[in-house]
């Protein structure tokens, strides 16, 4: 199957891919994947919550929204020294990229200098940096860029026509605007969504269509499987068929051939066999560590054992070729789990 980078995908084309038999879809996705990546290499990332809970938004899936009784206690923004200590520990464990997340609608201008200090201090350790802080304006994005930030994560979450069923406090266009601000200042983008929220296949097609027709494909595409947290409105939602999740990964790989397709939240509930199918479908990135912000993640020992069983190895450094060729020569580096052979 051709791996030409396209930005003109149609909903009809994506539906046709989803409708293929699963073996045929896996074959096509794997063929595209092998044209750009080593199928035995998996990028492994880590994430630290630098400001937990108390978010004013109403995202129906999120345990950090202050309006939901989920047992998450709001905390202040961490001190720079504490973040640097965590980053130093990550580096000793083999990290080459350190991600910082804050439960904000958007950072206040007064918060930017402290975040910038975190970025500079982490960068000084020789680590790549990424952040997910909510909506940004151009000035804030530029300040983070000037501090040395490499990646910015801002998900669109779902399709435009399902979005209002999940979130009411932020518009879909707000998310697209933040992505534009991030791209405009030269930061690399990480953008994906969540499935298993009660959406239909049409909505999953709509999510991927949004991502695959952006002016530049995201450098990383996190695909999250809903983690149902008691107290959130989506707790009790019917679970997604695992094979439908695999189809989501495969179509993401075909439509965005050069992007890192990341298994993100929800991996704790996935069997080793399901994760293998996802890797065969083109997923080539995972989050590594026992916690993703406030939700559980597989223990590092389980991931190490899985890599050994499957003959996989962590991706250390790779040349990241942008889909619009604006990032030639940039290094796309994430955590390396050095104890896995």
From Swiss-Prot:
Lineage top rank: taxon: Bacteria
Key words, A-Z: 2Fe-2S, 4Fe-4S, Biotin biosynthesis, Iron, Iron-sulfur, Metal-binding, S-adenosyl-L-methionine, Transferase
Biological pathway: Cofactor biosynthesis; biotin biosynthesis; biotin from 7,8-diaminononanoate: step 2/2
Amino acids binding [2Fe-2S] cluster: 99, 130, 190, 262
GO molecular function, a single term: 4 iron, 4 sulfur cluster binding
BP term (GO), one: biotin biosynthetic process
SUPFAM superfamilies cross-referenced by the UniProt entry: Radical SAM enzymes (SSF102114)
Cofactor names: [4Fe-4S] cluster; [2Fe-2S] cluster
Quaternary structure annotation from Swiss-Prot or TrEMBL: Homodimer.
Similarity comment: Belongs to the radical SAM superfamily. Biotin synthase family.
Functional note: Catalyzes the conversion of dethiobiotin (DTB) to biotin by the insertion of a sulfur atom into dethiobiotin via a radical-based mechanism.
Protein name: Biotin synthase
Taxonomic source organism: Xylella fastidiosa (strain Temecula1 / ATCC 700964)
Gene designation: bioB
